[in-house]
Design a protein with these regions (language model features):
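Short gly/ser/thr-rich secondary-structure transition/capping motifs
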Residues: 5-7, 53, 95
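Short beta-strand segments
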Residues: 21-55, 72
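Extreme N-terminal tail/first-helix region
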Residues: 1-22, 129
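Short solvent-exposed loop/turn micro-motifs enriched in small/polar/acidic residues
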Residues: 18-20, 33-34, 87, 103-105
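Flexible glycine-rich active-site/ligand-binding loops centered on an Asp-His dyad
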Residues: 109-129
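A generic structural signal for ordered secondary structure
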Residues: 17-18, 49, 109-114
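A generic local structural motif
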Residues: 9-12, 36-37, 57-59
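Short, structured beta-strand-loop surface elements
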Residues: 55-116
Length: 129
């Protein structure tokens, strides 16, 4: 991982993260070819972990080996009327980590260290205009 700075999350953000099971991870090859994939994830309060049943065969795995910069988005619709999207977008660096107790059991995971975050409708009430 690049830096020692730890990004912190508000209690509202942590509650939202823990209420969701699906996210999207965006990676890029060393040439800059982009890829985005829906993924399950774990959050330990500091890092996000992304696994897969055959992780080492995925584009995201290969891309992280070549280029550690990633984006990670957790989002949903809290309501349709009024229209209330919610999201937490993370930018950060990723590496590979072996975990004994991840959501898929003992395995290799992509570990994401958040360095920047942007939220919509999580830390304050949504006001429809």
């Amino acid at each position: 991982m690049e830096t020692n700075t730890v990004l912190t999350f508000t209690q509202e953000e942590v509650d939202y993260i823990r209420s969701q099971r699906l996210a999207r991870i965006a990676t890029a090859s060393k040439k800059g070819d982009p890829d985005v994939a829906p993924v399950g994830f774990d959050f330990d309060g500091t890092y996000f972990y992304v696994g897969g049943h055959i992780l080492i065969r995925t584009i995201k795995y290969k891309n992280v080996l070549e280029n550690p910069k990633v984006s990670f988005v957790i989002d949903d619709l809290a309501s349709i009327k009024p229209w209330t999207p919610r999201s937490l977008k993370i930018r950060g660096t990723a590496d590979l980590a072996d975990r004994d107790n991840g959501y898929l059991g003992p395995a290799k995971y992509i570990r994401i260290k958040p360095t920047h975050k942007t939220t919509i409708n999580i830390n304050r009430p949504f006001k429809y205009r």
